[in-house]
Amino acid sequence: MHLPTFPRAMPVTRRVQTDFRGYDHRPGCPEGGIYEMTNGSAADAPLFSTRPGRTLTYPTGGGSANGLFAVDGGLLWCTGQTLYFNGTPVDGCTLVNGPKVFAELGGTVLIWPDKVWYRPDMGTFGSAEPSWSGTVALQRSDDSSGARADSVAASGIDTPFRVGDAVTFSGFSTPEDNGTYIIRAIAGAVLVFDPDTFSAVGAVEHITVTRRMPLALHACTYANRIWACAQDTVWCTKLGDPLSWYWYEADDNGTIATAAWSVDVGTPGN
């Protein structure tokens, strides 16, 4: 089979360029100049080089840098007492001026030692260790008779907490009423717990209710939990919930795989 050929009108030549004249976007661009250039640089002329990587510069407000954390969609850091997300101060969020520890799960970032949560997608923040103090009345959540109570009622007691939170009571005059219990329901200004949790229906007490959070020196995310440690103690959250640290309960099958977890080790860490 014979294929057509093109006659060679010019001899084969070889050209070596030893002089780089930089970027020159003019019709008369000389030999050695570059008319079009992408990601190149003339900074090292007469040598040709690629440009350095681009960087973003954010304002720091002039304070001391206390922590930096990469989160989905941007960069979070603390300078002085101000929390920044992608260079914009988080309005109303004032932190302690000092080193920070960050960890994130499910779009919620936890910040220590302030014990604050922040959600970058919504721009919202709040206390990761909410607490309420005041006078409560112990009562039953149903109409059944009985001497023991399963709920506490007080104006505003429902605001800081969620159904399913494990909250710790302190201040009861009856010591056995103090402890950590899981909120089963919230009915207006009433927190409902398991039947017969508290000792006496009708009692009026001044107490404190807190959803506790450990004071971590180091934290990370692994296996759909946030893990934290300080000195000789390691904690992890309830599975999938970055705000539940002292939630210890088995499911209907007796499985505790979703519960929070903590352990004291023999030797403190550094």
Q: Positions of the model-derived regions?
A:
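Recognizes the extracellular SEMA beta-propeller fold with strongest preference
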Residues: 1-270
